[in-house]
């Protein structure tokens, strides 16, 4: 039995609320159960120096957690003077995931920065961030389209992410913190709307996992991502 009493293939309650920030070109408040992330997408008429003059744009991401997003206060990274390795890893993952489904040529010579700020963390902050980031980016591109700023279709597909793991010997979908902290194996899957794999991160926490167990986790992830993609489409409809 899962601590949340969910079925093995059951997502937490997921919501994707578009257009929640007044000033941002795109935004989304994403909730995976008790994990809540505020995502904004900001259009900037500038590019990294190494991209100038190439006729294409860029999508990048930043990620952070509020001090009391966790059970005990976490010191702000700005106060520490540097980002920790986990933060850097996650924001690079978010940026990579979004760029796989964006036509950077169609975007033109401009940059969209996606900021993911974790308001409350209960497991799966990176997967919630990626899923909400797609909605915020779509919201930003819709804003640009109404102003005739785009050459063509920028978004090629959806992209979403979900965690899976082996908990008490059973493959389960969408781990919360209670499960994640006790799981024998946990993995994050980033996939496109048509089911292609963008990235897989998997770790055996206690004992190695078999190929069959990995395939069982991937099957759960495919089911979960398909549901998330449906919710994304509803959010931007």
Swiss-Prot record:
GO BP, one annotated term: tRNA processing
Subunit structure: Homohexameric ring arranged as a trimer of dimers.
Keyword Transferase: yes
Gene responsible for this protein: rph
Provenance organism: Rhodopseudomonas palustris (strain HaA2)
InterPro entries the UniProt entry points to: ExoRNase_PH_dom1 (IPR001247), ExoRNase_PH_dom2 (IPR015847), ExoRNase_PH_dom2_sf (IPR036345), PNPase/RNase_PH_dom_sf (IPR027408), Ribosomal_Su5_D2-typ_SF (IPR020568), RNase_PH (IPR050080), RNase_PH_bac-type (IPR002381), RNase_PH_CS (IPR018336)
Official protein name in the record: Ribonuclease PH
Annotated catalysed reactions: tRNA(n+1) + phosphate = tRNA(n) + a ribonucleoside 5'-diphosphate
GO terms of molecular function: 3'-5'-RNA exonuclease activity; tRNA binding; tRNA nucleotidyltransferase activity
Function: Phosphorolytic 3'-5' exoribonuclease that plays an important role in tRNA 3'-end maturation. Removes nucleotide residues following the 3'-CCA terminus of tRNAs; can also add nucleotides to the ends of RNA molecules by using nucleoside diphosphates as substrates, but this may not be physiologically important. Probably plays a role in initiation of 16S rRNA degradation (leading to ribosome degradation) during starvation.
Keywords carried by this UniProt record: Nucleotidyltransferase, RNA-binding, rRNA processing, Transferase, tRNA processing, tRNA-binding
Family: Belongs to the RNase PH family.
EC number: 2.7.7.56
Record: residues binding phosphate: 86, 124-126
Disulfide bonds: none
Native organism taxonomy: Bacteria, Pseudomonadati, Pseudomonadota, Alphaproteobacteria, Hyphomicrobiales
Domain of life: Bacteria
EC class (word): transferase
